[in-house]
A protein has these predicted regions:
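Residue-level signal for alpha-helix termini/capping positions
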Residues: 25, 48-51, 107-108
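Helix-loop element at the rim of GNAT/NAT acetyltransferase active sites that forms part
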Residues: 22-36
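Acyl-donor (CoA/ACP) binding surface of acyl/acetyltransferases
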Residues: 1-18, 23, 59-165
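Active-site rim helix/loop that mediates acceptor-substrate recognition in acyltransferases
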Residues: 36-55
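Generic structural signal for secondary-structure transition and capping sites
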Residues: 17, 28-29, 52-56, 111
């Protein structure tokens, strides 16, 4: 971990719905992500509907909730990681600590390959992934759709990165 930074990950529960809505509603925290759930009941339903392969965690710094991260496992021994932190924790080594812990969890699960996606304008995330030897695979487009099929404002250009474990 970064010197002086010790974060903990604990499983996301339905009791975290209000925190998750606050995180998703923070314009700076969510600006690089596709459309986020900002309705409390919808967030609770999403958390309740998580599948066993979807490992979602609350990021804690000194017992304070500072973000959320995920390790979503596929059937082919691969997984995708992701994370979001409140802006006041950016640039302090917290993202590095989160990625380190996700990599360790992936190793413990015998994951052979990891992917991560980020907005092409999120230079901090791109630098962080590169620091951990993730290689850029491609640049594409994520289209955020509502339940009725209409495009949401969260559509954006993304870069996908891959790391062989």
């Amino acid at each position: 971990m970064e010197q002086g930074i010790e974060i903990k990950l604990r499983p996301l529960t339905v009791n975290d719905a209000d925190f998750m809505v606050a995180l998703a509603s923070n314009p700076d925290a969510a600006k690089y992500l596709p459309a986020m759930i900002t309705d409390r009941q919808m967030m609770k339903d999403w958390i309740k509907g998580l599948e066993p392969k979807e490992h979602e965690y609350i990021v804690l710094l000194d017992d304070t909730k500072i973000g959320e991260c995920s390790l979503v496992v596929s059937t082919d021994h691969s997984a995708e990681i992701g994370f979001i932190l409140f802006p006041e924790y950016w640039g302090r080594g917290c993202g590095t600590a989160v990625v380190r812990q996700l990599l360790e969890k992936a190793r413990q699960m015998s994951i052979g390959e990891l992917t991560a996606k980020t907005n092409v304008n999120n230079t901090a995330a791109i630098q962080l992934l590169t620091k951990f030897d993730f290689q850029k695979q491609y640049i594409g487009w994520i289209l955020a759709l509502a339940d009725d099929g209409n495009e949401l404002s969260g559509s954006q250009t993304i870069a996908q990165f891959k790391k062989t474990m």
